[in-house]
Design a protein with these regions (language model features):
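A short, structural micro-pattern
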Residues: 111, 144-146, 213-215
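A structural signal for short, well-ordered beta-strand segments
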Residues: 115-117, 150-152, 219-223
């Protein structure tokens, strides 16, 4: 049998075929673990989302009784579920390009497991500067992704502002690498405002040190297959909002919340048949 020759390679008999931008980005993520999607949101909308995130954070500080109480549980720099507070973050979570990439990697049934605003202040240590997976404490790998993270950049991600740092390919290894190997592989991912950094949630990553003199803000989304429970129940937090929108109801997990009773489970199944 003769060797098959393809452009830029030889001895290759199988090759990936990425016919769309989403498929190409998904292939990159399968191999490297991450990819940058630039220019996903306009500059005007990015600025608006930054103001809205600041307001959500201020409201959550007030709701919980002050910044000191939040700091006592290590949560003073995280605005949780901003989509519950502001519809602009609903649109961000349902970004068509990001969902297309997620469906390439996870299949058609994609659920938003969590959405968190992340604030990396200048000159302060954020909990996210430690290496972690977005599915923490898990030391196994799967043949296909279980969850995909999409980190939306409100401010520039650079060496000065503390760009997210990845260990490429670590979504395919069970253990965290040795200290020396982690340092060798550690890669800063720069991105402009309005970009998404999309990555396999099992990639080990961390926030960089912000030395810019101003906060570096982002909104992280974790999309998953429906067998993984949400961090915070979005159907409960939303109090039924968007339940009548089939696409958003599925995305926000309305169809996969545990049934409250046997009868409720059967009624839900019957309702699905009637759709």
């Amino acid at each position: 049998m003769s060797d098959s020759v393809t452009p830029g390679a030889y001895g290759v008999v199988e090759r990936g075929a990425a016919s769309t931008d989403a498929a190409r980005i998904a292939e990159h993520i399968r191999i490297a673990g991450y990819a940058v999607v630039p220019g996903a949101v306009s500059s005007a909308d990015v600025a608006d989302l930054g103001l809205r995130l600041d307001r959500v954070m201020a409201r959550q500080v007030e709701e919980f009784g002050g910044a000191e109480r939040l700091a006592s549980i290590g949560d003073a720099l995280t605005a949780r579920c901003p989509l519950v507070y502001d519809e602009a973050f609903v649109a961000l979570a349902a970004h068509a390009t990001v969902l297309a990439i997620c469906r390439e990697l996870l299949g058609d049934y994609v659920v938003l497991m969590q959405q968190n605003g992340v604030i990396n202040p200048s000159g302060q240590r954020h909990t996210q500067v430690a290496y972690h997976r977005d599915l923490p404490y898990q030391h196994f790998v799967s043949s296909r992704p279980l969850a995909i993270s999409a980190l939306f950049c409100i401010d520039p991600f650079s060496s000065e502002t503390g760009a997210t740092r990845m260990i490429p390919g670590s979504h395919r290894t069970e253990q965290f690498p040795s200290e020396s190997v982690a340092a060798e592989l550690d890669t800063a991912v720069s991105a402009a405002p309005g970009s998404f950094i999309v990555f396999d949630s099992m990639v080990f990553h961390r926030a960089g040190e912000n030395r810019s003199g101003r906060p570096r803000r982002a909104v992280n989304h974790v999309f998953s297959v429906p067998i993984i429970a949400q961090q915070i129940s979005l159907p409960d937090a939303l109090n039924g909002r968007y339940a009548d929108d089939p696409a958003l109801a599925r995305l926000f997990g309305y169809d996969v919340t545990p049934a409250r009773s046997v009868t409720a489970w059967r009624e839900r199944r019957l309702a699905r048949q009637d759709r």
